[in-house]
């Protein structure tokens, strides 16, 4: 085969010349439009195209095994039909034709198509040319005929003219006719040529447009093929096509078989034909389009770390959803951490944070209190940053009976200690006094061990702590605790050494003991100011006040006086006539009657304000303690009190806090530790002392509750089933009767209805005004509930000297009593080489053949052991009795 040019080859394969030159260039062959192409270059181009199209890696043979299961209804016995499952297994082999053959075939098809187009073009041109020639021939014949006719006429005229005028040789009309005939012939030839040129140009333009369209289509197909090769696998595509072909063939065979069975099968059971028709219809309607075999999920190769947003409470299921794990994974993790939880259990924020961090996630703690923040942000302080000096808040702390209230009493020039039950302070007293050098606010805290929380609360709200130490008693446990509270609050400490009027006062001892706990006197090079006072005579009190004001001046205590007030609840109680009453220490701003107060879980509008002396006031500035009325409930001591603008929003915030407090409380109560599981199992064996407790103020209630709960032991548990502030009511009495509880009133009494219920139900009611007595009596009641303890006490010991045989009693041991007394009614043990070998009771005790009840030390006796005959010489018989021992807590 001779070499062809690039242009001719492009025409043969049906591609544009530019595309073919580009493919030659990609194959490493540089060609122009008029260059010749050899067979070797064609083969090189073909190999390159095969490689680019993936022809080398394409599978040449594929075997598919298919299994189809169908149901055939056949006639059975009795005219009934039954379904028989038919399983058809097929193996089909598909052979893919070589890519080169496909390419050659495509080229041959393109070449044949081009040749057909060229042949059609040539035939069209030949047809047009033949038509033009036929038309021209017809015109020529017509012209020749006209010319012959004209010639004949001309000859006739010429002959006539010759006859008439012999001198004239030719006719002018004939010449004109000849010229006109030549002109018409030239015009006809020119029109025919112009028409042929136009038709040829149209055919060439049509061929060019067809070639461009084919080139664009082939380029698009090439681009789509490459795109498909990038995202799919040739084997998968081949498998899909083969499967589609096989599915189509299988369905045709299945339908043909079913039609044949339907014709030949006898009467079937009711509904069989409809079922088969439905199945055939389903098979006919089933899509045979190939489905993708590639899944779209890839297994993660690394752990996914998420930002988990946790609110104040969250359930186990919600936490699992936030971390995108199963709830069982969280339950397993918490079991490893020592907690047993369920899927719906509420977790507090700290627990959820630990679990999420343990599982490798980042935790973002969120506070769901946007409304609360909005309400508090709407507070305005009219004074802005204008700060004014304020009075110092001084807390009097120290051990019980060291003279705290007496010292404050002297300062206030009023008898306060005498009004306290038992001479000890039961709750915080807040007072402000005017001195010559300025005003001072005092907080008097209890010194008893039960009032730890109240002392801590006092240290939290104070500026200066005055530690009262008795000069004759020294440092005591509550003194040390007060020092710890002051250090924890980073509050300056002033030591007031009281009872200096007593002859037993020892100043050096007090300084030395305080120095051991980090409180060093200025005389000894320390930082703490010491004042030596006597609350009885008033000696040194002025020096103490001067030292307090000096310390306050050093601290530069300032606060915003104008604007909305904020403070802290010092004490709260439920008054029978006035309702909830809260003692608030104003810390900033001015508290006025009529203000809306948000106080912990409670809210309300201030209906009345009273100072510590019970006088009504209308406003209170910084460092002033005041009693307010009008709250919705009794707030907890230590809560922050804030004045807000909108009562409706304050109510919403209070309700939100109550709900959140309940959720957090439940979340903490639901914790069940693994180490407590066995204790929980045996909890039913623990005896409980149920108590209904009512107190006059919140602080005393907390102190008594903590003290009573601390009395619980492994055997007796104190269970406070109800507690509150205020008088004992009929509801309390009914609850105590139903739960077999003791009713305890601390500085409160039962009302008339409650007394009737108590009398009718025989409920144990006890009143107390001193916390010592309450704790002691509860402890005595718990002691009576303890299960008795029994102890075995040895009362006698006898040594076997000889053994006698008795026909009635068997072996009789002749013994000498070496210790104590042998009693016939007491149980005994037989010891051999100091090892107990038998435990039982005496059957016979005789002395000189007489039955006796007991034998004393140093006497001989005969002992018969019941159901035991292996008594030997040298054994010891030990007599003991079981004694009940009284138990104490």
Curated annotation (Swiss-Prot):
Region (G2): 423-427
Protein's UniProt name: Translation initiation factor IF-2
GO cellular component, one term: cytosol
Organism (species): Shewanella sp. (strain ANA-3)
Function: One of the essential components for the initiation of protein synthesis. Protects formylmethionyl-tRNA from spontaneous hydrolysis and promotes its binding to the 30S ribosomal subunits. Also involved in the hydrolysis of GTP during the formation of the 70S ribosomal complex.
Residue spans of biased composition, Basic and acidic residues class: 115-236, 271-280
Annotated spans, Disordered: 115-293
Residues covered by region (G4): 498-501
Span list, region G1: 398-405
Chief place where the protein resides: cytoplasm
Subcellular location: Cytoplasm
